[in-house]
């Protein structure tokens, strides 16, 4: 039996979907523990590409139980759309389980997200405007509506009526917008409730029972460590906790039940939206990496900002998550470069910082200190074991391990499931 938590070790978009898909082969359950449809996974199996936002990547295996935990906020229209899209490709969602305690996203959350982002102007966060933040706000304010409420027709109608009364007061009096129609929202969400009711259950019982039975469980986080509401580059963060500790809270298990934590990082680093980015490439090389790596958001289509691998941020992710291993993806994107760089520290007003600062003012003024290593020209997309990689590529990986303090257990050399090198047993 092994319980493995898979987390993003950067600003999200690290390739967690591919790694989850690869590791799901030996898992009995695959569990999503936080976030919403502001995150996206792209998984390539054979000649087919799957883009998932809420459903765990393990759904592509017919014998896996896939779970959406209570830490997730759910847009039921998006979830049902994903289920229907999978069905059209012959993928069953019969093994999907949804937590009764997961909170629901409503049209007023999405509208609030949009109007607040517009109001902030140049001070905007860079939200996806999917309603994620406002849904988590309602959850913390104890006025949210959960899946257990949604599937109870009488309870749901009363809760929605009160929430929409409050939100419409805000829209009309503060923002000068017309009110949302209660009747149409009620009708739509009653339809969603009927479609999803059979999937809604107490997932904590299912997962704890699976642990007792000695099954392998893979917990997958969305976004990444540097977007965590507490540990990320606040306020340019998400509204939930992508870090490993949140896996326990987000599904209803105790911390002693976790056996291993794996962090996923690209061989370089990217971020979407606003916020400081010390190793960002603001030149033609950044454009080259973006195009070669296909660095455009799965959810928004926005171009991602690209930079050299940040070892300071990597060490931070290892520390706050307690990472046992790193999985390094997209190593193939760096093939063909004469030189490759790894940031080992930050120069700040004449001092070297070896740890990731909390202050955005400090982070914005940090200048990366690089180790420069020779690149490799070979096509590595066909490599299936470590010895298949060129010596310079192996040295680059070794240096990442040295700088971050975490051994590398998995290497991605392409987008397909088969384009993976495993160097350690993870279950």
Swiss-Prot record:
Homodimer. It is found in: Cytoplasm. Plays an important role in the de novo pathway of purine nucleotide biosynthesis. Catalyzes the first committed step in the biosynthesis of AMP from IMP. GTP binds at residues 12-18, 40-42, 304, 330-332, 412-414. Gene3D superfamilies: Adenylosuccinate Synthetase, subunit A, domain 1, Adenylosuccinate Synthetase, subunit A, domain 2, Adenylosuccinate Synthetase, subunit A, domain 3. Substrate binds at residues 298-304. Its cofactor is Mg(2+). GO terms for molecular function: adenylosuccinate synthase activity; GTP binding; magnesium ion binding. HAMAP family: Adenylosucc_synth (MF_00011). Its EC number is 6.3.4.4. IMP binds at residues 13-16, 38-41, 128, 142, 223, 238, 302. It comes from Pelotomaculum thermopropionicum (strain DSM 13744 / JCM 10971 / SI). GO terms for cellular component: cytoplasm. This is Adenylosuccinate synthetase.
């Amino acid at each position: 039996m092994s319980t493995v938590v898979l987390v993003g070790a950067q600003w999200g978009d690290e390739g967690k979907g591919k790694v989850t898909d690869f590791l799901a082969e030996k898992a009995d359950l695959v569990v999503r523990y936080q976030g919403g449809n502001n995150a996206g996974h792209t998984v390539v199996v054979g000649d087919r590409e799957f883009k998932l936002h809420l459903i765990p990547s393990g759904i592509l295996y017919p014998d896996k139980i896939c779970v959406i935990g209570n830490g997730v906020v759910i847009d039921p229209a998006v979830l049902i759309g994903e289920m229907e899209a999978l069905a059209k490709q012959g993928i069953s969602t019969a093994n999907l389980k949804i937590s009764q305690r997961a909170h629901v996203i409503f049209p007023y959350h999405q509208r609030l997200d949009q109007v607040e982002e517009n109001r902030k102007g140049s001070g905007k966060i860079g939200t996806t405007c999917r309603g994620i933040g406002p849904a988590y706000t309602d959850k913390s304010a104890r006025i949210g509506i959960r899946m257990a409420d949604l599937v109870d027709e009488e309870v749901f109608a009363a809760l929605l009526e009160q929430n929409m009364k409050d939100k419409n007061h805000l829209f009309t009096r503060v923002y000068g917008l017309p009110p949302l129609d209660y009747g149409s929202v009620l009708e739509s969400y009653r339809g969603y409730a009927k479609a999803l009711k059979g999937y809604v259950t107490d997932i904590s019982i299912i997962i704890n029972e699976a642990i007792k039975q000695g099954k392998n469980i893979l917990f997958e986080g969305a976004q990444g460590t540097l977007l965590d509401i507490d540990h990320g580059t606040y306020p340019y963060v998400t509204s939930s906790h992508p870090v490993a500790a949140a896996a326990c809270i987000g599904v209803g298990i105790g911390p002693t039940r976790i056996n291993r934590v794996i962090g996923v990082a690209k061989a370089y680093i990217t971020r979407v939206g606003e916020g400081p980015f010390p190793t960002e490439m603001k030149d033609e090389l950044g454009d080259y990496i973006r195009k070669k790596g296909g660095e455009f958001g799965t959810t928004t289509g926005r171009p991602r900002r690209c930079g050299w691998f940040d070892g300071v941020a990597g060490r931070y992710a290892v520390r706050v998550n307690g990472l046992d291993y790193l999985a390094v993806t997209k190593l193939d994107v760096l093939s063909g470069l004469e030189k490759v760089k790894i940031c080992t520290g930050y120069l700040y007003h004449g001092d070297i910082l070896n740890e990731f600062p909390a202050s955005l003012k400090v982070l914005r003024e940090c200048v990366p200190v690089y180790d420069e290593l020779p690149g490799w020209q070979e096509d590595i997309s066909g490599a299936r074991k470590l010895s298949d990689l060129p010596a310079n590529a192996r040295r680059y990986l070794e240096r990442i391990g040295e700088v971050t303090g975490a051994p590398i257990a998995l290497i991605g050399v392409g987008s397909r499931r088969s384009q993976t090198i495993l160097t350690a047993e993870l279950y």
